[in-house]
Regions:
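Active-site pocket-lining/capping segments in soluble small-molecule metabolic enzymes
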Residues: 1-127
């Protein structure tokens, strides 16, 4: 968080503070090759540990494989104190109701927390 505070002294800062982060982009549709084209509707890859990675399909059958865990920082006071100019909520697989719950949580009004979450690299820093 100190690195974000230092950076904001020189320019406005934005960070993704909620959502599934993309892990990989493929040139070929991974779902079409295995189960047939689903046009991006609910495709998921499952690894050997049972973790489920949502697959978002885009133009030209490119697929974006999302993290199995959702980045969540609403319950971290450091996120509010670090001085971000903008915080981006990245909705990908959420229902409209879940989007409302997330928004309320980030506006200090809820207690919703995702089932499987990650803090991303916010506590590791950049070397």
């Amino acid at each position: 968080w100190q690195q974000v505070r230092d950076l904001r002294k020189y320019l406005p800062c934005e960070a993704i503070i909620y959502g599934r982060l993309p892990l990989m982009v493929t040139e070929n549709c991974v779902t079409r090759c295995s189960v047939g084209c689903t046009h991006g509707a609910g495709s998921v890859l499952t690894d050997r540990t049972g973790a489920r990675f949502p697959v978002l399909c885009g133009y030209g059958c490119r697929c974006e494989i999302q993290n199995s865990k959702t980045l969540f920082l609403a319950d971290k006071p450091e996120m509010r104190r670090c001085g971000l100019t903008y915080g981006r909520l990245r909705f990908t697989t959420e229902t409209p109701e879940q989007c409302v719950q997330v928004l309320k949580r980030y506006q200090n009004g809820g207690n919703w927390t995702p089932e499987d979450l990650t803090r991303g690299l916010f506590y590791r820093g950049v070397e």
